[in-house]
Protein backbone atom coordinates (compact mmCIF):
# COMPACT_ATOMS: atom_id res chain seq x y z
CA UNK A 1 0.00 0.00 0.00
CA UNK A 2 1.35 3.43 -0.90
CA UNK A 3 2.34 5.69 2.01
CA UNK A 4 -0.53 8.12 1.36
CA UNK A 5 -3.07 5.30 1.33
CA UNK A 6 -1.50 3.82 4.47
CA UNK A 7 -1.84 7.18 6.25
CA UNK A 8 -5.50 7.48 5.25
CA UNK A 9 -6.24 3.97 6.50
CA UNK A 10 -4.45 4.76 9.76
CA UNK A 11 -6.59 7.88 10.21
CA UNK A 12 -9.74 5.80 9.75
CA UNK A 13 -8.40 3.24 12.23
CA UNK A 14 -8.08 6.05 14.78
CA UNK A 15 -11.66 7.13 14.03
CA UNK A 16 -13.15 3.64 14.24
CA UNK A 17 -14.19 3.63 17.91
CA UNK A 18 -16.14 6.89 17.87
CA UNK A 19 -17.49 6.30 14.35
CA UNK A 20 -19.05 2.99 15.30
CA UNK A 21 -20.56 4.09 18.59
CA UNK A 22 -21.87 7.64 17.96
CA UNK A 23 -25.11 7.85 15.95
CA UNK A 24 -26.59 11.37 15.62
CA UNK A 25 -30.17 11.44 14.34
CA UNK A 26 -29.07 12.78 10.94
CA UNK A 27 -26.87 9.71 10.50
CA UNK A 28 -29.66 7.44 11.72
CA UNK A 29 -32.03 8.83 9.08
CA UNK A 30 -29.37 8.37 6.40
CA UNK A 31 -28.79 4.73 7.32
CA UNK A 32 -32.52 4.03 7.39
CA UNK A 33 -33.12 5.60 3.97
CA UNK A 34 -30.18 3.88 2.28
CA UNK A 35 -31.07 0.49 3.77
CA UNK A 36 -34.67 0.77 2.55
CA UNK A 37 -33.45 0.40 -1.06
CA UNK A 38 -31.54 -2.83 -0.45
CA UNK A 39 -32.53 -6.32 -1.57
CA UNK A 40 -30.90 -9.70 -2.19
CA UNK A 41 -27.15 -9.92 -1.67
CA UNK A 42 -25.89 -6.47 -0.62
CA UNK A 43 -22.34 -5.15 -0.99
CA UNK A 44 -21.27 -2.09 1.01
CA UNK A 45 -18.34 -0.25 -0.59
CA UNK A 46 -16.41 1.50 2.19
CA UNK A 47 -18.35 -0.08 5.05
CA UNK A 48 -16.38 1.50 7.91
CA UNK A 49 -17.36 0.01 11.25
CA UNK A 50 -20.52 -1.57 9.86
CA UNK A 51 -23.00 0.86 11.43
CA UNK A 52 -25.51 0.18 8.69
CA UNK A 53 -25.40 -3.62 9.05
CA UNK A 54 -28.45 -3.96 11.36
CA UNK A 55 -30.48 -1.59 9.17
CA UNK A 56 -29.64 -3.57 6.02
CA UNK A 57 -30.16 -7.02 7.50
CA UNK A 58 -33.61 -6.15 8.85
CA UNK A 59 -34.88 -5.44 5.33
CA UNK A 60 -37.22 -8.31 4.37
CA UNK A 61 -35.84 -8.66 0.82
CA UNK A 62 -32.17 -8.74 1.90
CA UNK A 63 -30.58 -12.19 2.02
CA UNK A 64 -26.93 -11.42 2.88
CA UNK A 65 -24.39 -8.61 3.30
CA UNK A 66 -20.73 -8.08 2.38
CA UNK A 67 -18.71 -5.02 3.40
CA UNK A 68 -15.38 -3.80 2.03
CA UNK A 69 -13.02 -1.40 3.77
CA UNK A 70 -9.31 -0.54 3.60
CA UNK A 71 -8.91 0.33 7.31
CA UNK A 72 -8.13 -2.78 9.35
CA UNK A 73 -9.61 -1.54 12.63
CA UNK A 74 -12.82 -0.56 10.84
CA UNK A 75 -12.95 -4.08 9.40
CA UNK A 76 -12.54 -5.62 12.85
CA UNK A 77 -15.37 -3.52 14.23
CA UNK A 78 -17.61 -4.28 11.25
CA UNK A 79 -17.04 -8.00 11.77
CA UNK A 80 -18.04 -7.60 15.42
CA UNK A 81 -21.18 -5.73 14.34
CA UNK A 82 -22.14 -8.51 11.94
CA UNK A 83 -21.75 -11.05 14.74
CA UNK A 84 -24.37 -9.18 16.79
CA UNK A 85 -26.98 -9.79 14.07
CA UNK A 86 -26.45 -13.43 13.02
CA UNK A 87 -29.92 -14.04 11.54
CA UNK A 88 -28.54 -13.41 8.02
CA UNK A 89 -24.96 -14.00 6.82
CA UNK A 90 -22.49 -11.13 6.69
CA UNK A 91 -18.90 -11.03 5.46
CA UNK A 92 -16.35 -8.22 5.79
CA UNK A 93 -13.39 -7.96 3.40
CA UNK A 94 -10.23 -5.98 4.15
CA UNK A 95 -8.92 -4.22 1.04
CA UNK A 96 -9.34 -1.41 -1.45
CA UNK A 97 -12.56 -1.47 -3.44
CA UNK A 98 -10.81 -1.43 -6.80
CA UNK A 99 -8.70 -4.48 -5.87
CA UNK A 100 -11.04 -6.92 -4.10
CA UNK A 101 -13.02 -9.85 -5.48
CA UNK A 102 -16.47 -10.48 -4.00
CA UNK A 103 -19.72 -12.12 -5.07
CA UNK A 104 -21.73 -9.93 -7.44
CA UNK A 105 -24.36 -7.79 -5.71
CA UNK A 106 -28.11 -7.60 -6.27
CA UNK A 107 -27.92 -4.16 -4.65
CA UNK A 108 -25.11 -2.05 -3.27
CA UNK A 109 -24.37 1.04 -1.22
CA UNK A 110 -21.60 3.45 -0.34
CA UNK A 111 -21.99 6.02 2.43
CA UNK A 112 -19.44 8.81 2.89
CA UNK A 113 -16.62 6.89 1.29
CA UNK A 114 -16.59 8.45 -2.20
CA UNK A 115 -14.89 11.68 -1.13
CA UNK A 116 -11.84 9.71 0.02
CA UNK A 117 -11.39 7.55 -3.11
CA UNK A 118 -8.08 8.30 -4.86
CA UNK A 119 -9.61 7.64 -8.32
CA UNK A 120 -13.39 8.03 -8.18
CA UNK A 121 -14.01 7.02 -11.81
CA UNK A 122 -11.98 3.82 -11.41
CA UNK A 123 -13.84 2.88 -8.22
CA UNK A 124 -17.26 3.62 -9.72
CA UNK A 125 -16.45 1.43 -12.72
CA UNK A 126 -15.33 -1.37 -10.38
CA UNK A 127 -18.61 -1.10 -8.46
CA UNK A 128 -20.46 -1.37 -11.77
CA UNK A 129 -18.57 -4.59 -12.53
CA UNK A 130 -19.55 -6.05 -9.14
CA UNK A 131 -23.26 -5.19 -9.53
CA UNK A 132 -25.66 -7.49 -11.35
CA UNK A 133 -27.50 -6.06 -14.39
CA UNK A 134 -30.48 -4.02 -13.22
CA UNK A 135 -29.03 -3.76 -9.72
CA UNK A 136 -29.50 -0.71 -7.50
CA UNK A 137 -26.53 1.23 -6.13
CA UNK A 138 -27.15 3.94 -3.51
CA UNK A 139 -24.32 6.46 -3.33
CA UNK A 140 -24.38 8.96 -0.44
CA UNK A 141 -21.57 11.45 0.05
CA UNK A 142 -21.08 14.81 1.72
CA UNK A 143 -21.13 17.66 -0.77
CA UNK A 144 -19.55 21.04 -1.32
CA UNK A 145 -22.55 22.57 0.50
CA UNK A 146 -21.91 20.82 3.80
CA UNK A 147 -21.62 23.05 6.89
CA UNK A 148 -19.96 20.53 9.19
CA UNK A 149 -19.64 22.92 12.12
CA UNK A 150 -23.37 23.66 12.09
CA UNK A 151 -24.23 19.98 11.69
CA UNK A 152 -22.05 19.01 14.64
CA UNK A 153 -23.42 21.85 16.75
CA UNK A 154 -26.93 20.50 16.19
CA UNK A 155 -25.81 16.93 16.93
CA UNK A 156 -24.12 17.98 20.17
CA UNK A 157 -27.52 18.57 21.78
CA UNK A 158 -28.26 14.84 21.55
CA UNK A 159 -24.75 13.35 21.77
CA UNK A 160 -22.83 15.55 24.22
CA UNK A 161 -23.00 12.97 27.04
CA UNK A 162 -21.65 10.16 24.86
CA UNK A 163 -18.13 9.21 26.05
CA UNK A 164 -16.78 9.27 22.48
CA UNK A 165 -18.60 12.40 21.28
CA UNK A 166 -15.61 14.77 21.49
CA UNK A 167 -13.45 12.34 19.52
CA UNK A 168 -16.20 11.93 16.90
CA UNK A 169 -16.64 15.70 16.57
CA UNK A 170 -12.93 16.43 16.20
CA UNK A 171 -12.39 13.77 13.56
CA UNK A 172 -15.30 15.03 11.47
CA UNK A 173 -13.99 18.57 11.65
CA UNK A 174 -10.60 17.34 10.43
CA UNK A 175 -12.23 15.55 7.51
CA UNK A 176 -13.82 18.74 6.24
CA UNK A 177 -10.66 20.77 6.78
CA UNK A 178 -8.63 18.34 4.66
CA UNK A 179 -7.54 19.51 1.22
CA UNK A 180 -7.41 15.93 -0.10
CA UNK A 181 -11.13 15.08 0.00
CA UNK A 182 -13.37 15.44 -3.05
CA UNK A 183 -16.59 17.38 -2.48
CA UNK A 184 -18.82 17.93 -5.51
CA UNK A 185 -22.06 19.72 -6.22
CA UNK A 186 -24.97 17.37 -6.92
CA UNK A 187 -25.02 18.05 -10.66
CA UNK A 188 -21.28 17.33 -10.91
CA UNK A 189 -21.73 14.03 -9.09
CA UNK A 190 -24.60 13.05 -11.38
CA UNK A 191 -22.47 13.67 -14.47
CA UNK A 192 -19.67 11.53 -13.03
CA UNK A 193 -21.85 8.51 -12.21
CA UNK A 194 -23.51 8.71 -15.62
CA UNK A 195 -20.08 8.76 -17.28
CA UNK A 196 -19.27 5.59 -15.31
CA UNK A 197 -22.31 3.85 -16.83
CA UNK A 198 -25.05 4.28 -14.22
CA UNK A 199 -28.54 5.67 -14.78
CA UNK A 200 -30.03 7.91 -12.07
CA UNK A 201 -33.39 6.88 -10.58
CA UNK A 202 -33.38 9.47 -7.77
CA UNK A 203 -31.14 12.29 -6.55
CA UNK A 204 -31.64 14.64 -3.60
CA UNK A 205 -29.97 16.66 -0.85
CA UNK A 206 -32.61 16.32 1.88
CA UNK A 207 -30.22 15.05 4.58
CA UNK A 208 -27.40 16.65 6.59
CA UNK A 209 -29.19 20.02 6.27
CA UNK A 210 -28.64 19.94 2.50
CA UNK A 211 -24.96 19.01 2.82
CA UNK A 212 -25.18 15.43 1.59
CA UNK A 213 -25.94 14.16 -1.92
CA UNK A 214 -27.88 10.90 -2.14
CA UNK A 215 -28.21 9.15 -5.49
CA UNK A 216 -30.19 6.01 -6.26
CA UNK A 217 -28.46 4.55 -9.30
CA UNK A 218 -29.15 1.59 -11.54
CA UNK A 219 -26.92 -0.60 -13.66
CA UNK A 220 -28.26 -1.21 -17.17
CA UNK A 221 -29.88 -4.59 -17.77
CA UNK A 222 -27.61 -4.95 -20.80
CA UNK A 223 -24.28 -4.47 -19.02
CA UNK A 224 -22.37 -7.53 -17.85
Language model: regions and residue ranges:
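Class I SAM-dependent methyltransferase SAM/SAH-binding core
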Residues: 49-99
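A short SAM/SAH-binding and catalytic strip from SAM-dependent methyltransferases
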Residues: 107-120
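A short acidic, Gly/Pro-enriched loop at the edge of an enzyme's catalytic core
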Residues: 98-108
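A short glycine-rich, Lys/Arg-flanked "PGG" loop and its adjoining helix->strand segment in the class I
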Residues: 121-133
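Short alpha-helix
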Residues: 180-196
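Conserved class I S-adenosyl-L-methionine
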Residues: 1-38, 40-48, 51-55, 138-165
